[in-house]
Amino acid sequence: MKKIILAGGCFWGVEEFLSRINGVVSTEVGYANGRTENPTYEDICTKNTYFAEVCLVNYDENIISLKELLAKFWTIIDPTSLNKQGNDVGSQYRTGIYYVDPSDLEEILNSKEELQKSYSKKIVTEVKPLENYYKAEEYHQKYLKKNPNGYCHIKLD
């Protein structure tokens, strides 16, 4: 079982999209790489905590490779947009790939470099080791499964 943490704007849609991928074993939304401890959703939105809304993904590398997973992730974000995805604006909506296994870094950078060839603008998706992670409140978990008509900036159909 492998783990990767992906930020692509509002985590509700990112989690729903990723949870539908064959080989993804589990997903959880949370807050990553910020400046405080135990942030709440309100903290993320109103204070300068610098956390990103993220989806923690556990996947079976025998079914889907990191390269394949990232290829799918790139399709749901605008990697050239800084601190904004869809109608959501703020540093918490930045795009990022946060790794826990240093051996994943080369594959992540290769994926980003390959994608850059398709864009004239610079890709601003950050690639960093996971520094800290806090699970989001329960009402955010599987939000679009519980609220099928809830807000989502990603086309899921």
UniProtKB/Swiss-Prot annotation:
Q: Report if keyword Oxidoreductase is assigned.
A: yes
Protein task:
Has an important function as a repair enzyme for proteins that have been inactivated by oxidation. Catalyzes the reversible oxidation-reduction of methionine sulfoxide in proteins to methionine.
Q: Does the keyword GTP-binding apply?
A: no
- MF term (GO), any: peptide-methionine (S)-S-oxide reductase activity
Q: What class of enzyme is it?
A: oxidoreductase
Q: Which reaction does it catalyse?
A: L-methionyl-[protein] + [thioredoxin]-disulfide + H2O = L-methionyl-(S)-S-oxide-[protein] + [thioredoxin]-dithiol; [thioredoxin]-disulfide + L-methionine + H2O = L-methionine (S)-S-oxide + [thioredoxin]-dithiol
Q: Name one Pfam family in it.
A: PMSR
Active site (UniProt): C10
Judging by the UniProt lineage, the source's domain of life is Bacteria
Q: What is its EC number?
A: 1.8.4.11
Record's protein name: Peptide methionine sulfoxide reductase MsrA
**Ranges in coiled-coil conformation:** none
Stated family: Belongs to the MsrA Met sulfoxide reductase family.
Arranged from A to Z, the UniProt key words for this protein are:
Oxidoreductase
What GO cellular component entries does it have? Answer: cytoplasm
Enumerate the HAMAP family for this protein.
MsrA (MF_01401)
Cite the SUPFAM superfamilies for this sequence.
Answer: Peptide methionine sulfoxide reductase (SSF55068)
GO biological process terms on file: cellular response to oxidative stress; protein modification process
